[in-house]
Amino acid sequence: MLTPSRTDQIVETALQAVRSASDWKAVLDELPVPTYITDADGAVTYWNRACVHFAGRQPRLGQDRWCVTWELYTATGDRLLHEDCPMAAAIKGQCEIRGEVAIALRPDGTRRAFTPYPTPLFDQAGNLTGAVNLLIDVTDEQASALNEQAVRCKRLADAIHNKRDAAILSKMADGFAATALALRASTSSNG
């Protein structure tokens, strides 16, 4: 697991390289985290080697839009369309997005939870040229958080007397537990 200060350092290294280094691809290729760049329309124009391992697939330059992953889900397991993902929001809103968690579904069925760091890129005139995104793997942490949420929902369901509300909470607990289990299975099968 990366520490917050190490994550900040990696993000800053990537941003400095993309904004000013003529050899930015070499810098990004050496980063230990999945990193990719899109144009202003969201088409993927570059990805580093770590993206392939993380996404479980080779991204398609110019064809994949907004993200290098196959499918996306919210932190709680609901489907997240690529055009609604944090990278899309960063480009459309022309602002950094921080503090989000998403789950990537790989073609082999395994899942990885991650925190994205999408950051728009601008030319010297202030025009949007694209964005860079780093994906920090938080699978273990997210699985633990989902398990804790499942336990809380189950406890609450057991404590209330309204059967309808208890059933809703039990179903929520089952969903959180299932998503956590899918994440744990992914870490034990191929990390």
Q: Language-model features: where?
A:
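Conserved hydrophobic beta-strand signature of PAS-family and PAS-like sensory domains
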Residues: T35, V44-T45
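PAS/PAS-like sensory domains across diverse signaling proteins
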Residues: D41-A43, H53
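N-terminal capping loop/helix in small sensory signaling domains highlighted by a polar->aromatic N-x2-3-F motif
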Residues: N48-C51
